[in-house]
Amino acid sequence: LVIAPQWIGDAVMTEPLLRRLAARGERLTVGALPWVAPVYRAMPQVADVIDFPFQHGGLQLKARRAIARQIEGRFSTAYVLPNSLKSALLPLLAGIPKRVGYLGEARVGLLTHRLKNPKNKPPMVAFYSALSGESGLEADRPVLKLPPAEVDAALNALGLQPGGYAVFAPGAEFGPAKRWPAAHFAAVARGLDVPVLLLGSGKEAALCDEIAAAAPGRCTNLAGKTTLLQALAAISAARHVVSNDSGLMHVAAAFGVRQVAVFGSSSPLHTPPLNDRATVLWLKNDPAYQPPLDCAPCFERECPLGHTRCLNDIDAGRVLASL
């Protein structure tokens, strides 16, 4: 049993771990929250996906005990990918004898095979892959695959033709210090020769409306209007994807789509889009940008200095040139 992370990007970055486990003969069932479960259904090495009925926050012991009773006796090993206490509870309650995970949140007694959290910030793909117990791991590229029939059905439902559009994912759940300005996204939309789909959650609908209004006739706002499966399919068949450091950035990378990823407060050394067709724009490592961004990466939700130069100063022309 694999206990999945709760964010789309993190879920994508676990794929190389699951590939390693499957290659050595382990039959994989993934337990995931409903909003990330479709990501695991796009991984052929996953035999089964259990949708966990949990919500953000709280231990929700009653719900965890109920699931534990349902899966008791089915699994010999659990890989607990999140570092939270509550994530490690279910395998214990289900009586799974081998429970593998990183130390954290006072869960030393909940795990039987414990890894220490690295003091540096390794690439997240390598961080997850280390749970396999194998040494010398590198950050392998995550790969997602959807059955062609599912892609065709999703594109037909959205009225799309493969390669006939670009996708913008302008949101970033973490906070505004990871979001490239709406005006910059709109400028890119005006400069492209294909229509643009704006994808994201319902929380990002207003942001996408702002972009669409600034690029009249160029954008279709689908934020909050698609299933995650439809969003995955749309990204997989897009000509280009432009995004911040977000979950949908990792989805585009895993499908090998041509993409530009704009980084601000976070670091592409930690969560890069592992894709040969990706261009990363990050002013921190641009020697031509002056004065240097000594403040980056700050990993803050909002710019503590109030200027957000790391994002504001990446103009639309650089993105268009990269596409």
Please report, for each region that a protein language model flagged, where it lies by residue:
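Catalytic machinery of carbohydrate-active enzymes
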Residues: 1-323
